[in-house]
Amino acid sequence: MIVIDLFSGAGGLSEGFHKHDFKIAAHVEKEYWACETIKTRLFYHFLKAQNDLELYHEYLRVSDNYRNIEQSRAFVFQRYPELREKLEMEVLNRKFGNPHNDPTATSSTQMIQLIQNSLQYSRATSVDLIIGGPPCQAYSLVGRSRMKDSVGKDSRNYLFQYYKRIVDEFKPKAFVFENVPGILTAKQGKVYQEIKESFDQIGYTVLSGTSQEDRSNVIDFADFGVPQRRKRVILFGFQKKLNYEYPNFERHKLSWNSPLTTRDVISDLPVLKPKQGHDLRLFEYDTTQGVDQLSPYELMMREDSIGFTNHFARPIKERDAEIYQIAIEHATQGRQIKYNELPERLKTHKNEKAFLDRFKVHWWDIIPHTVVAHISKDGHYNIHPDIEQCRSLTVREAARIQGFPDNYKFEGPRTAQYTQVGNAVPPLMSGIIARAVKDVINGHH
C-alpha cells in the first residue's frame, strides 16, 4: 500500500506504518533536522533489508557531530550509491505556504509536483493512504490560554486548506492523522465542523472515533500499552463511496503483564549527572547487565540494536537542582510538588497560578506523563526520579517514553532532538493505528 506522509516530524507516525508493510513514497516536513532524522531512519530500514545492519552500526559509531553529518554518511553512500537518490526523492524538506508572503514556503502546486516525482520514483501509480496532518498547535488546549489573542490569526490554522488540496489531488482511499483533543472543542466545536464540511465537499467522510458524540472520542495512548499518558484524537477520513468503518485500535493494543511504569521504561539506561553523556555518540550496551534484569519493554526497545545515542544530561542551575531535589522527595511520598509550596527564595515567577504544575517528576512506580515539545526549552516538567542523578530526562529517556527503539537516532543539536521527540506520534501507537487501518482497507477489497 502506497503512503504519503505529510508533516512527518521525526517520522514517528510513518515508523509504525513502515513496520506493517506500507510503502512510504514521500515524507514532507519543514524542519531541517527532523528530515535528517528521517533520512537516518531510512538508512536503517534500507540496510536492514540488505541484511547489512553492521554498516548502520558503523554509521552510529562515527557520526558524533551534527555539523559534519554529510561526511559521516559518505562511506554508506559509497557502498550503496543508490541511497543518495532514494533520500532525495523520499524526504522532502519543504514547508507548505504561500511563497508570495513567505519566501521559504512551497506552493501547493509545486508541492504536488514534488510528490508526483516521488511517486514516480517509487513506481507508484496511485496513493492508498495519506498519513499525518496539519499540526493544530493553535487549537491545543495547552496552547489556548497562552495564545488567547493569536488563535484567530495563526497561519498554521490554514494549513489544513493545503492538506485538503493534497488529499483532493491524490485521492487516497483514506487519510489518518493524530491531533490534540482541542481540535474537537475549539470554538465550541465549530473548527471540527468546518474540517468535516470541507472534506465533505471533496467527497470524504471524516470520523473522530466510534462515538457519535465527538468529544468522547479522545483516547489515551496509555490504554493501548504505550508507556505514557497521552490523550489524543485520531481522525480518519475516507472516500464516501467506500463507506469504511472507524478502525478498531483496541484489537491491536499491546498487552504487558502489568501496566508499564517509568522503572520498566528507563531504568536500564546509564546513570548520568548533569552535563554527562553524549548528544550523538553511541553508547554500547553494558554487556555485564544480565538480560533477566531487563523489563520486557526494555528488551523490546533494544531489538536490532547494539546501543543508543542521544543520552546527554543537560546542565542545571543551582536553584533548579534544589527544586528538583524537593520535587523528588515529594514524589517519594506519592505527591507532586506545587509551585506555591516551594520556599520563597526558590520562586522566580510572580504568577504562581500559571506555574502551579511547573515541576513534575516521572516517578519510578507510575506510568510516565505526557512528553511534549516544551521539553526542548527546559526539563522542569520531566524530572528524572533518581535523586542521586538530580536532572531532567535525556533525549533518549524521553524517546523511550515515546516508544522509539534504541536504534532510532535523532539528528541535529540537542534542542532540535528534544523538539522532535516531544512532537512525535509514539511509534508503538502508530503501529497499532497502521494495523487497524490495514484491516479496514483490506476488509473492503
Curated annotation (Swiss-Prot):
The keyword Ligase does not apply. It catalyses: a 2'-deoxycytidine in DNA + S-adenosyl-L-methionine = a 5-methyl-2'-deoxycytidine in DNA + S-adenosyl-L-homocysteine + H(+). GO terms for molecular function: DNA (cytosine-5-)-methyltransferase activity; DNA binding. Residues 1-444 form the SAM-dependent MTase C5-type domain. The active site is at C136. Pfam families: DNA_methylase (PF00145). It is found in: Cytoplasm. It comes from the Bacteria. Disruption phenotype: Cannot be deleted in a DISARM-containing strain of B.subtilis. GO terms for biological process: defense response to virus; DNA restriction-modification system; methylation; negative regulation of gene expression via chromosomal CpG island methylation. Its EC number is 2.1.1.37. One of its GO terms (cellular component) is cytoplasm. The keyword Transferase applies. It is an enzyme of class 2 (transferase). Keywords: Antiviral defense, Cytoplasm, Methyltransferase, Restriction system, S-adenosyl-L-methionine, Transferase. Belongs to the class I-like SAM-binding methyltransferase superfamily. C5-methyltransferase family. Component of antiviral defense system DISARM (defense island system associated with restriction-modification), composed of DrmE, DrmA, DrmB, DrmC and DrmMII. DISARM is probably a multi-gene restriction module, this subunit is a DNA methylase. Expression of DISARM in B.subtilis (strain BEST7003) confers resistance to phages Nf, phi29, phi105, phi3T, SPO1, SPR and SPP1. Protection is over 10(7)-fold against phi3T, 10(4)-10(5)-fold against Nf, phi29, phi105 and SPR, 100-fold against SPO1 and 10-fold against SPP1. This is Type II methyltransferase M.Bpa9945I. It comes from Bacillus paralicheniformis (strain ATCC 9945a / NCIMB 11709 / CD-2). The lineage of its organism: Bacteria, Bacillati, Bacillota, Bacilli, Bacillales. The gene is drmMII.
